[in-house]
């Protein structure tokens, strides 16, 4: 059996129980036990004639206990009494007096039970039996009570005496309760008190009812007739106490019980009662006021409640008082109750009996129910300070003692035995137990021994020597051995030996010391924002032989993943907390535990964020509202772990701008109040928002609203302007005041104006709108203008004078051009002379320069004209036009403009010189042989002058020699050039540039490439084969730069012999650049092996299997193609195609023809957008945005996406423009025909078939 040591320590606390009784584990010995009373009747029993009376007395002991009773100190034998039934149950001496014989009165008295066996006698406490008869009210004659109105009266009750006080109720003959209040009330004695009587109290049936719960009966007193004599003059009188009647009294209160004090007063008007405790404050938590304050009940009386309690009765004429002097006393109570003990021979027995009470109780000792004087003849017992002491006890000294304490308030009794026994030593802990603990902890090896005398216990190691030589080993009195600071070498066997004068016994304990659990990486404290997530990591090392786990706690609570929430994610020693809130902050612990130990590592999480709402907004100093001020205060907001930097104070006017908040300012974060400067006539509702480094928090709840008084405006409108929108008027405008500056419910504006420089009378008008139109003015005349705010409280401050102007007219003068300076082929400077301001008819805003391209110098454009604009300020008389096309004609116009619009234009025409041409288009490399390449290209899109030819250069990309070779090609119409004597092992970089008469070479186009030998064996990229029922398609991607060649393709049916030789496909010649080949007339559902062969060298092979899913090539013999309907159908299609071709030819003829070299003259700006005449912006030129764009849909993109001819294009794309023949090795044996080449070279104006030297159409 393995004992987990961390659960052992609490067991040690129970070790004192060995002194109280023999352990249950001590088996095999018939141990005797002195009598112990287990149940007895209460100290006082009140019974009635019909009740059964049970007197209980039960006790345990070995041998069997015998019982006897005394009544009033005389031996009482229940079995011999008539009407008494004795309980025959084991361990019981109880008996019952049957109530149906009305014997209760005869059995009144004080009883005591004695339980005895040969070891001693136990004694019960005294049981007082009180028998009562049926309660009866004595016969009496009740006389009417006569009293004058306003006087006091007491109606007596005087119920029959009883051991159990009855409950009193006052009712009338109709069984209705007598209403009680401050004037009429019942005292604790049952009497009914009237502080003063009224005529309404005149009744003849005041009946006192007494309820006796013990007999379950209610008896009535004879009705009392209360006669009230009316009077016309009720005399006021000061209070007088009806109970108690004297000025003071003394009471004794028992500690722990309740104290009831009562004061009932009479007087007119009816007095009120209050209670005073002069020495100390009244203990309000234990005081109950009842009966309209006439009764004070003090609960759980203690010694501190000693002292004076005064009741004070008051009305308008005076007062009366009574002083209760309360003394707190106590019945006896235990400080230390004597306990039963087991002793061995020769030991000293001591029984302590410490009792307290007020007055101090008297303590007496009994032995086996007999007084000390009777049994202590040899003076063996002695009593010291209430304790009973016996020295050198022997088995014959076994006894049961009684300690009894008594004062006038009660008595206490306790039985305790001294049991002197002789028992052999026995170890109650199981033998050969295994204990496990971890290094560094404390192990507890148990050895619970029992015997009489108490055995001595010692621990030995495997060699039989005591273990106490090591200071880490410590034995406890209960036999347990503790080993602190455990080490791995403490593992082993230990022996516990217990011995007394009768025998000795030994048990074995096995100790295993394991590695202690350690946290190698604990969680680290973190500060995270609200809404973020945090990850805590924990790693630990464990003893490999123990089951281990890592768990997490948050503020001491175990954390677990919940299926209905993704708040926590726990896995592999990680704790992830999602969607952090402020409630998540706290201490988080990683707990690494085994069944033996656990270690914990803590980290603190702080959740930071914007502050919480500001609480407790309060307005004060409202008298300052007359000065448009108020004091606002608040309590600090929750800072959420980031100091509050400032508070933002905002207001809302629910009348003028509901749900819109305006800032009144900010105060430092350590300030929680401020006096606000307010505007007149605003309905203010305030709120405050706290701000820290993470931003503003939630706004506070809104404050109550306040309204400031009205006042005259303190501001005038700003941004006053005078401008005409017609030539004969002036529109005066201004920025209206915000409503919070009105200072009143409404606002108006007093507008004044007069011509500038003339001391004329101000013309004025008051308006509500933020504008005024002044009509019938002269064109562009200056005016002095003033605008003043006005409300029902007065005018605003004196306004400032603003100069405005009446309406403008169009300028009447055009700028005179001075000259045009040409900087280069794309930039010119245009200059003009300033215009006469008197002719502008308004404010000169600037000049508008308009220019547009008319065409190249060789040919003017007939296309849509796009105009570009530049706007320059009024103080500038020149403009730079940039981004122009070289070798082109331009038209320029300059106009002055004012607020009304543009004036007349000055015109000029100029031309730009030739410039550098653009780069040639579409440079392609075509392999001719392993040492030669054919280059072909297209001319530049932008000639920028007259082309004079091309400059071609190239050099190897790698290798030792990088000599640059140049070819000056002087024919501008040239489109191809053949290069020979190239090294087949090198890669070359080719560069081609165009030239003009005045510039060049221009921008270059660059390509890299080489001949076939550079790339070695041909590459069939992404080759694949697909099949139908009787055909197969082989497809591949020709490699870029690879020379074209021919090869055989052979389909061979598998297995051999499946297909007859007549149906075997014959080898076919295929060109590399054609990218695919289709083989027909294959057999369905047959596997074929495909071989690609060149000069008996296998280039590639693959397999394919035919099926029935594809189209079937049909033989012409007997097919539907010979049917008449099919021939007619094909003829109709051909006819339709001819008609379409004719229509297309007609349409192209109407569109005109143009050569490639003139394309730059006919380009159209597809994105051109004409500028509105009335729109003038910053300096800009749309020319540069659009001049260099391609033709749109008719020209290729210039972004490099065009594939070079001869790379991915197959020879089939060239149509009939080239005659090509191949030898067996794939080399060319023919040349381009002279006719085709001539047509291609001179076909720039046509859109005929594409050829290798005329790719214009192929680029589309």
UniProtKB/Swiss-Prot annotation:
GO molecular function list: identical protein binding; integrin binding; sialic acid binding
Domain Fibronectin type-III as annotated: residue spans: 613-711, 716-809, 811-916, 919-1015, 1014-1112
Residue ranges, compositional bias (Polar residues): 1244-1253
Glycan-bearing residues: 100, 202, 246, 293, 432, 478, 489, 504, 587, 670, 725, 776, 824, 848, 875, 968, 978, 1022, 1030, 1073, 1107
Tissue and organ distribution: Expressed in the brain, including in the molecular layer of the cerebellar cortex, the fiber-rich layers of the hippocampus (alveus, and strata lacunosum moleculare, radiatum, and oriens), the nerve fiber layer and the inner and outer plexiform layers of the retina, and in the molecular layer of the olfactory bulb (at protein level).
Family annotation (InterPro entries): FN3_dom, FN3_sf, Ig-like_dom, Ig-like_dom_sf, Ig-like_fold, Ig_I-set, Ig_sub, Ig_sub2
SMART domains assigned: FN3 (SM00060), IG (SM00409), IGc2 (SM00408)
Signal peptide: 1-19
Gene3D superfamilies, A to Z: Immunoglobulins
GO biological process: axon guidance; calcium-mediated signaling; cell migration; cell surface receptor signaling pathway; cell-cell adhesion mediated by integrin; cell-matrix adhesion; heterophilic cell-cell adhesion via plasma membrane cell adhesion molecules; homophilic cell adhesion via plasma membrane adhesion molecules
Topology feature Cytoplasmic, residues: 1147-1260
Chain intervals with Basic and acidic residues compositional bias: 712-724
Residue interval(s) of motif Cell attachment site: 553-555, 562-564
Ranges that cross the membrane: 1124-1146
Any Pfam family hit: Ig_3
Location(s), subcellular: Cell membrane; Cell projection, Growth cone
Main location: membrane
Extracellular topological domain residue ranges: 20-1123
Location of region: Disordered: 697-724, 1183-1210, 1229-1260
UniProt keyword list: Cell adhesion, Cell membrane, Cell projection, Developmental protein, Differentiation, Disulfide bond, Glycoprotein, Immunoglobulin domain, Membrane, Neurogenesis, Phosphoprotein, Repeat, Signal, Transmembrane, Transmembrane helix
Record PANTHER family: CTX-RELATED TYPE I TRANSMEMBRANE PROTEIN, L1 CELL ADHESION MOLECULE
Similarity comment text for this entry: Belongs to the immunoglobulin superfamily. L1/neurofascin/NgCAM family.
Subunit structure: Interacts with SHTN1; the interaction occurs in axonal growth cones. Interacts with isoform 2 of BSG.
Protein name per its UniProtKB record: Neural cell adhesion molecule L1
């Amino acid at each position: 059996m393995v004992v987990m040591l961390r659960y052992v320590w609490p067991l040690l606390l129970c070790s004192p129980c060995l002194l109280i009784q023999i352990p249950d584990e001590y088996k095999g010995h018939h141990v005797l036990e002195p009598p112990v009373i287990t149940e007895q009747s209460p100290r006082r029993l009140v019974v009635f004639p019909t009740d059964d009376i049970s007197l209980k007395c039960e006790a345990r002991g070995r041998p069997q206990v015998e019982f006897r009773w005394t009544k009033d100190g005389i031996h009482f034998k229940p079995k011999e009494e008539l009407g008494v039934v004795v309980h025959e149950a084991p361990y019981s001496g109880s008996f019952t007096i049957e109530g149906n014989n009305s014997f209760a009165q005869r059995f009144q008295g004080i009883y005591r039970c004695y339980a005895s066996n040969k070891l001693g006698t136990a004694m019960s406490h005294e049981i007082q039996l009180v028998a009562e008869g049926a309660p009866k009210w004595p016969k009496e004659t009740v006389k009417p009570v006569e009293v004058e109105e306003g006087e006091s009266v007491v109606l007596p009750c005087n119920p029959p005496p009883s051991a159990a006080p009855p409950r009193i109720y006052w009712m009338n003959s109709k069984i209705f309760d007598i209403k009680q209040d401050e004037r009429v009330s019942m005292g604790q004695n049952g009497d009914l008190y009237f502080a003063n009587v009224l005529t309404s109290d005149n009744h003849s049936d005041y009946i006192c009812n007494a309820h006796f719960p013990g007999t379950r009966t209610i008896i009535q007193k004879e009705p009392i007739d209360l006669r009230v004599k009316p009077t016309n003059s009720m005399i006021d009188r000061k209070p007088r106490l009806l109970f108690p009647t004297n000025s003071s009294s003394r009471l004794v209160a028992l500690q722990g019980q309740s104290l009831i004090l009562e004061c009932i007063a009479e007087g007119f008007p009816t007095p009120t009662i209050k209670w005073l405790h002069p020495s100390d404050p009244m203990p309000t938590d234990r005081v109950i006021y009842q009966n309209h304050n006439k009764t004070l009940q003090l609960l759980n009386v203690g010694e501190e409640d000693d002292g004076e309690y005064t009741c004070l009765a008051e009305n308008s004429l005076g007062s009366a008082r009574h002083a209760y002097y309360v003394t707190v006393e106590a019945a006896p109570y235990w400080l230390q109750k004597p306990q039963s003990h087991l002793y061995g021979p020769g030991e000293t027995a001591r029984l302590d009996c410490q009792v307290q009470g007020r007055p101090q109780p008297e303590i007496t000792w009994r032995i086996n129910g007999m007084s000390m004087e009777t049994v202590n003849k040899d003076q063996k017992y002695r009593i010291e300070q209430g304790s009973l002491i016996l020295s050198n006890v022997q088995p014959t000294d076994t006894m049961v003692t009684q300690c009894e304490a008594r004062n006038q308030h009660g008595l206490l009794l306790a039985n305790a035995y001294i049991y002197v026994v002789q028992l052999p030593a026995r170890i109650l802990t199981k033998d050969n137990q295994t204990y496990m603990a971890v290094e560094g902890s404390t192990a507890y090896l148990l050895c619970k021994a029992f015997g009489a005398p108490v055995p001595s216990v010692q621990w030995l190691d495997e060699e039989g020597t005591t273990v106490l030589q090591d200071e880490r080993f410590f034995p406890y009195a209960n036999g347990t051995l503790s080993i602190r600071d455990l080490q791995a070498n403490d593992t082993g066997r230990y022996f516990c030996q217990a011995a007394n004068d009768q025998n000795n016994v030994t048990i074995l304990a096995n100790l295993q010391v394991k590695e202690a659990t350690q946290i190698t990486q604990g969680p680290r404290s973190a500060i995270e924002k609200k809404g973020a997530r945090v990850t805590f990591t924990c790693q630990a090392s464990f003893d490999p032989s123990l089951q281990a786990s890592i768990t997490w706690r948050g503020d001491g609570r175990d954390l677990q993943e919940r299926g209905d929430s993704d708040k926590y994610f726990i896995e592999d020693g990680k704790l992830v907390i999602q969607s952090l809130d402020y409630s998540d902050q706290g201490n988080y612990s990683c707990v690494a535990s085994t069944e033996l130990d656990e270690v914990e590592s803590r980290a603190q999480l702080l959740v930071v964020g914007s502050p919480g709402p500001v609480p407790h907004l309060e307005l004060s100093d409202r008298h300052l509202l007359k000065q448009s001020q108020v004091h606002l205060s608040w309590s600090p907001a929750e800072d959420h772990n980031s100091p509050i930097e400032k508070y933002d104070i905002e207001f809302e006017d629910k009348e003028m701008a509901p749900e819109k908040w305006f800032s009144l300012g900010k105060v430092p974060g350590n300030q929680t109040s401020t006096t606000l400067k307010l505007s007149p006539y605003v309905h203010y509702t305030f709120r405050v928002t706290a701000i820290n480094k993470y931003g503003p928090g939630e706004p506070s709840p809104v404050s109550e609203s306040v309204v400031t008084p009205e006042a005259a405006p303190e501001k005038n409108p700003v941004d006053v302007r005078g401008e005409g929108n017609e030539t004969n008027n002036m529109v005066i405008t201004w920025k209206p005041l915000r409503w919070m500056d009105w200072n009143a419910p409404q606002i108006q504006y007093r507008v004044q104006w007069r011509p500038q420089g003339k001391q004329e009378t101000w013309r004025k008008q008051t308006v509500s709108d933020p504008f005024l139109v002044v009509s019938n003015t002269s064109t562009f005349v200056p005016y002095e203008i003033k605008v003043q705010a006005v409300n029902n409280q007065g005018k605003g401050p004196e306004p400032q004078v603003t100069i405005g102007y009446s309406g403008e007219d169009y300028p009447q003068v055009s700028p005179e051009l001075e000259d045009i300076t040409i900087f280069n082929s794309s930039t010119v400077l245009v200059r003009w002379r300033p215009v006469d301001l008197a002719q502008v008819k308004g404010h000169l805003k600037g000049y508008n320069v308009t220019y547009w391209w008319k065409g190249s110098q060789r040919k003017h454009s007939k296309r849509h004209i796009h105009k570009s604009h530049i706007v320059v300020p009024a103080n500038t008389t020149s403009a730079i036009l940039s981004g122009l096309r070289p070798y082109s004609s331009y038209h320029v116009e300059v106009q002055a403009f004012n607020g009304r619009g543009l004036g007349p234009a000055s015109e000029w025409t100029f031309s730009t010189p030739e410039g550098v041409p653009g780069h040639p288009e579409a440079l392609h490399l075509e392999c001719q042989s392993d040492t030669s390449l054919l280059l072909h290209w297209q001319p530049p899109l932008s000639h920028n002058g007259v082309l004079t030819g091309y400059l071609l250069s190239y050099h190897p990309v790698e290798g030792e020699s990088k000599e640059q070779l140049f070819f000056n090609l002087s024919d501008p119409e040239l489109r191809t050039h053949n290069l020979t004597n190239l090294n087949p092992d090198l890669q070359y970089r080719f560069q081609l540039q165009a030239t003009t008469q005045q510039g060049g070479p221009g921008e270059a186009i660059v390509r890299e490439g080489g001949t076939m030998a550079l790339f070695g064996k041909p590459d069939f990229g992404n080759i694949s084969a697909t099949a139908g029922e009787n055909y197969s398609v082989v497809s591949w991607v020709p490699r870029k730069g690879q020379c074209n060649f021919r090869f055989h393709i052979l389909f061979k049916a598998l297995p051999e012999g499946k297909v007859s030789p007549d149906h075997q496909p014959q080898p076919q010649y295929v060109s590399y650049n054609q990218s695919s080949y289709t083989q027909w007339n294959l057999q369905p559902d047959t596997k074929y092996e495909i071989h690609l062969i060149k000069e008996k060298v296998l280039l590639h092979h693959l397999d394919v299997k035919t099926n029935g899913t594809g189209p079937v090539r049909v033989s012409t013999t007997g097919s539907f193609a010979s049917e008449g309907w099919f021939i007619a159908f094909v003829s109709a299609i051909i006819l339709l195609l001819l008609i379409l071709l004719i229509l297309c030819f007609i349409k192209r003829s109407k569109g005109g023809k143009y050569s490639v070299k003139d394309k730059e003259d006919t380009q159209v700006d597809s994105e051109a957008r004409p500028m509105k005449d009335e729109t003038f912006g910053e300096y800009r030129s749309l020319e540069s945005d659009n001049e260099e764009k391609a033709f749109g849909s008719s020209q290729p993109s210039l972004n490099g996406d065009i594939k070079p001819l001869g790379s991915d294009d197959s020879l089939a794309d060239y149509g009939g423009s080239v005659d090509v023949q191949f030898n067996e090795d794939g080399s060319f044996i023919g040349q381009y025909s002279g006719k085709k080449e001539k047509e291609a070279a001179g076909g720039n104006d046509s859109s005929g078939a594409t050829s290798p030297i005329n790719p214009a159409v192929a680029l589309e």
